[in-house]
Amino acid sequence: MAKIFYGKQSIDKSDIDAAIKCLKSNFLTTGPKVLEFEKEISKTTGCKYSLSCNSGTSAIFLTALMLKLKKGDNIIIPNINFVASFNIFSFLGCNVYLADVDNRTGQATPDSIIECIKKEKIKKLKCFVTMPLGGLLTNIEEFYNIRKKYKCFWMEDNCHALGSDYIFKKKIEKAGSCKHSDFSIFSFHPIKAITTFEGGCINFRDKKHFEKAKLLRSHGIVRKKNYWDYDVILNGFNFRLNDVSAAVGISQIKRLKKFIAKRQNIAKLYFKLLK
């Protein structure tokens, strides 16, 4: 019996050519392609502050480190989601609570988040996470109101949602714009809308958060005038995306609308055949 994969990347000649060109260049990492890719993500999402990472999981971890999440901090996540966010928050010692999801969308709802707060008697909520399953963003105004009411951070796990839109007060906004949330996480794993092999990104509402995460992403290093002269000003890690992956991402994102249309057509076929 033939193995049927639940997802597969779409790679064409332009992606291969972009990778080869980068392999022949002077930079395989920390080069210009990473910055160019981040600019493309910013343009696609309408967010000024985009920071690439070597995976979506690293993007969540980097955000958690930037926020200094610690033992006893209260976090709410949807009970349908990839295990990465639960693993990271648990590893850091946070109290992780699971909000129920709507049986129509498979997503946590504002009511289920508030119900979780009341049921678990959470006095101080540090952060809640939403995940638009299949790229369908819902209840944005209500989630925004929760963020304001409880004075907490709102992280959007938008790994399914690159290229999606949502409506806020009758105005169309882009997924990942961070106009109403604090952080938006993207993944560029092969099954996502575009791929960089492995890769991810964080979009930020606040420039200060962006600058701190940028330091944490690369060993806490601050470069001086001469490239060999630098200081290490905080404990950081290596969560950087490489230039070859970024070059493929730049090529892929040019076909984002085509990729989304293909997925929409497949979804329509499922709805038709599974009536």
Region annotations inferred by a language model:
Residues 27-74, 88-92, 98-100:
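Phosphate-binding glycine-rich loop
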Residues 77, 98, 154-156:
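Hydrophobic residues in well-ordered beta-strands that form the structural core
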Residues 104-196, 201-203, 207-208:
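Active-site phosphate-binding strand-loop segment of PLP-dependent enzymes
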Residues 1-28, 32:
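N-terminal "arm"/small-domain region of PLP-dependent enzymes with the aminotransferase-like
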Residues 80-86:
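Conserved coil-to-alpha-helix start sites within the AMP-binding
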Residues 79, 95-105:
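Short beta-strand->loop structural element characteristic of the AMP-binding/adenylate-forming
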Residues 160-172, 180-275:
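Active-site region of PLP-dependent enzymes
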